[in-house]
Structure formats: C-alpha cells, structure tokens
Amino acid sequence: MLCEGAGVPIGVVVDGANRPDMRVVQPTLESIPVKRPAPTQRFPQGLCLDKGYDYDDVRDLVREFGYTAHIRARGEEAQAIKRHAGFKARRWVVERTHSWMNRFRRILIRWEKTPENFLALLHFVCALI
C-alpha cells in the first residue's frame, strides 16, 4: 500500500504475503490512479520505506519515478536504541492506515478466492478512508 502524508491510501497492490517487499515496489508505484504534480525544489516528493526496501535496485527505481527515497538502513534503529535510552521507534503513516483498514472485517481476513475481488474490496475501503 502507498499512502500520502496524512495516511490517505493512493495506491494498492495485492500480492502474496511470502513475497519479498522489494518485488512489489514497481507495481505499487504504478498503481497510483491520479497524475501527481512534478516535484519542485520547494516541494520535493519523498517516499518513506522501511528496512525491507534497503536495496540499490529499489533506490534506483524510486529515483526513476521521481521520488526521493527515505529508507532507514538495516541495524540503524537497533543502534539508536542502544545509544539513547528513551528512544522510541518511529511509527510509519502507512501502519496507521493499515489499522484504519482493519476496521473493515471483510478485508481483515481474506475470504475472497480471486485477487480481483479482494482488490475491488480494497479499493472500496480506500475510497471510504
């Protein structure tokens, strides 16, 4: 799922849970249905990703789409916890969006057999959010 800064979903892709995150970056970026404004010096467009996306291929792909990648390196958070006793992990906006989506029981547990039906339900829920 791809969401904007306030947590509104703007792109959704359905894929298997056992698939590496880096494999769904391109389909997710291509799933944005509206044309976004071009990034400017004053308003650069960043893309915050977690450690599962910390690969050069992902960084190159994100750059091709015109985003600035903000990816926390593997092990960086663990080092910050060791250095600062009161350090708390940063909560990503997309995690909050996932919790909003979990209010809809129909998508919390996937009962649909085809990915097309499940994707349609996801689009419906994203429109409601």
Identify the residue ranges that each predicted region occupies:
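Short, contiguous, pocket-lining structural segments
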Residues: 2, 17, 54
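Helix-centered, glycine/charged polyanion-binding patches within enzymatic domains
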Residues: 36-115
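Active-site beta-loop-alpha junctions of metal-dependent nucleic acid enzymes
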Residues: 13-38
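Generic leucine side-chain signal with a strong bias for well-ordered alpha-helical environments
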Residues: 2, 29, 47, 119-122
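Charged alpha-helix within mobile-element recombinases
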Residues: 117-129
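Short phosphate-engaging motifs
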Residues: 9, 21, 54
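Acidic, contiguous segments within the catalytic cores of piggyBac-derived transposases
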Residues: 14, 89, 125
